[in-house]
Amino acid sequence: MDKQKSAPSKWMISSMVVVAAIVALAIFVVVSNLGGKPAVDTSASTTPAGEVSPAGAPMTSATAAAGSSADGGASFCGLTAVEMTGTLTKAPVATWQLFGTTYVPAVDGHGPGKIDDDGYRHCYARTPTGALLAIANYDALDNPGTDAFTEKFVRTGTAPGPGREAAIEKLNEKLKQSATESSNPADRQIFQTIGFRILSYDGNTALVETASKSSAGYKVAWVQHLVWAEGDWKLLLADDASSLTDPTLISTLDGYIPWSA
């Protein structure tokens, strides 16, 4: 990593994992306040290969429900592919489409099975490929940067339960403040998926780690929890709408499966 570069400012990336993520719709919290440079050159990813649960990830009522709840229903948009076990050992062949300033993937039969008129992408197959596609597309939902997109994701893209309810409450508070606040688009960073690995998958839950590169040149990895609910893959939030795991700055893609447009 170029030590002359300053570390990226704190950005809660992608839609949904932390309170600021829900507000800002950006899927990676890039480490901030590092004194102008990363404190450690973190070449290791958020979760070492072979581990299926990041250390310190809190148990939530949503997590417990995901492990013991029923099916979650058939695909709400009619995707028929279902795999209750499995993983990915190579990158799926995807069609990449420019969405805002980020390329997003699609795989026939695995999703997204529904793209709304406003560009909102959802409905992914109950397969390891579908889970990966869900995360890669959710990462890009920040691009439109509208309150409507943010609210839609919080209400439909997060797992039902206390985390979603807390997120809606936080979002409503943010929307009330937005009339008196302003942001500088130039301060925002855009993230592009460049790699992944599936840490665990059982058809009801998935633990997916993605590696992305920011517009400032930094690489970041983050493990994200998905649960199958309401006929789609949903991002799992802690009960207070905070993140279940933290992102990590990385220097290489060692250990990841490269995957990009």
Name the predicted role of every residue range.
Residues 1-13:
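Short, low-complexity patches enriched in S/T/P/G
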Residues 2-3, 131-143, 208-213, 223-228:
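Primarily hydrophobic membrane-targeting regions of prokaryotic envelope proteins
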Residues 4-5, 16-17, 27-35, 51, ...:
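Low-complexity, intrinsically disordered terminal/linker segments enriched in charged
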Residues 13-21:
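Hydrophobic H-region at the start of alpha-helical membrane spans
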Residues 36-101, 261:
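N-terminal low-complexity, Pro/Thr-rich disordered segments
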Residues 74, 80-83, 89-111, 219-251:
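Short beta-strand edge/turn micro-motifs at domain boundaries
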Residues 99-175:
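Core segments of small alpha/beta cavity-forming domains
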Residues 147-232, 237-242, 246-254, 258:
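Structured, amphipathic secondary-structure segments that form assembly/contact surfaces
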